[in-house]
């Protein structure tokens, strides 16, 4: 099957996908489209949970989220986010992040299906970290090459219902065992495209060290974070891409190169999404650059 792609780059659209006839979509074809464009919108698909799962398995190896409280009641591979009480976990993703950056195997792809969207201006912000890196002068790139960055997700881990009334120290120790700080190369090379990617995150990256474990001047990290646009409170950075979507669309992106955060709109109402996260069998997150 040849998928119909409209546009190119972030937000390119794939049209005409029939959720009841996915057998003709090949893994190589859909992956190549994502690797090339980084963020694609499959328009008006409206799949059932089972069809959404089938498409996810075509894209890659589905990895369920490590915390069961996010799981769909019938399909634990599906991560459910919802502002409707009892339908999922609310207020997810309201900060810049890369999915599973804090785990030993960060995902290759993330795929989201909106089921309810409160208004036309609700969406997601994305930053292409390869484009950011390419924009930096050599003098700013040099201190980051060959270094390792430490990423600590713990202050963004949500308290579970089962944690209520437990001692905070006990909860903190459990979080630290499940998601301890982890180190990745500050600059990675994409295993498929070869692009170099500035692999840092304002809400999780705490320090940069050289190959011998010596702390790099914190100003280097601060300047790199500022260059990405993550610190821009108005979201006016030229590196920030705003993506809107509609119920029934599927948003699929390359999780190695794109970081994202939720864009809250002006309308009240319920937001409910399903998410799948996949590996592609290649080096994750990437090779040291």
UniProtKB/Swiss-Prot annotation:
Could you list this entry's UniProt keywords, alphabetically sorted: Dioxygenase, Iron, Metal-binding, Oxidoreductase
Q: Where does a (3R)-3-[(carboxymethyl)amino]fatty acid bind?
A: 65, 70, 93, 100, 158, 275
Report the gene knockout effect.
Answer: Deletion of the gene cluster mmaABCDE causes a significant decrease in the intracellular accumulation of zinc in Sauton's medium where metal concentrations are relatively low.
Gene3D superfamilies attached here?
A: Clavaminate synthase-like (3.60.130.10)
The broad enzyme category this protein falls into is oxidoreductase
Kindly give the Pfam families that the UniProt entry links to this protein.
TauD (PF02668)
Q: What is its EC number?
A: 1.14.11.78
Q: Which GO terms describe its molecular function?
A: dioxygenase activity; metal ion binding
Write out the catalysed reaction: a (3R)-3-[(carboxymethyl)amino]fatty acid + 2 2-oxoglutarate + 2 O2 = a (3R)-3-isocyanyl-fatty acid + 2 succinate + 3 CO2 + 2 H2O; a (3R)-3-[(carboxymethyl)amino]fatty acid + 2-oxoglutarate + O2 = a (3R)-3-{[carboxy(hydroxy)methyl]amino}fatty acid + succinate + CO2; a (3R)-3-{[carboxy(hydroxy)methyl]amino}fatty acid + 2-oxoglutarate + O2 = a (3R)-3-isocyanyl-fatty acid + succinate + 2 CO2 + 2 H2O
* Keyword Metal-binding set for record: yes
Record keyword Oxidoreductase present: yes
Binding-site positions, 2-oxoglutarate:
264
Q: Where does Fe(2+) bind?
A: 97, 99, 260
Q: Which InterPro entries does this entry report, sorted A to Z?
A: TauD-like_sf (IPR042098), TauD/TfdA-like (IPR003819), TfdA_dioxygenase (IPR051178)
Write down the required cofactor(s): Fe(2+)
Miscellaneous note, as given in the UniProt record, is:
Isonitrile formation goes through two consecutive, but distinctive, 2-oxoglutarate-dpendent reactions catalyzed by this enzyme. In the first reaction, an Fe(IV)-oxo species is utilized to generate a (3R)-3-{[carboxy(hydroxy)methyl]amino}fatty acid. Then, its conversion into a (3R)-3-isocyanyl-fatty acid likely proceeds by decarboxylation-assisted desaturation.
The family line of this record is: Belongs to the TfdA dioxygenase family.
| Biological role stated in the UniProt entry | Involved in the biosynthesis of a unique class of isonitrile lipopeptides (INLPs) that seem to play a role in metal acquisition in M.marinum. Catalyzes the conversion of (3R)-3-[(carboxymethyl)amino]fatty acids to (3R)-3-isocyanyl-fatty acids through an oxidative decarboxylation mechanism, thereby generating the isonitrile group of INLPs.
This protein is called: (3R)-3-[(carboxymethyl)amino]fatty acid oxygenase/decarboxylase
Q: Which organism is it from?
A: Mycobacterium marinum (strain ATCC BAA-535 / M)
Upper classification of the source organism reads: Bacteria, Bacillati, Actinomycetota, Actinomycetes, Mycobacteriales
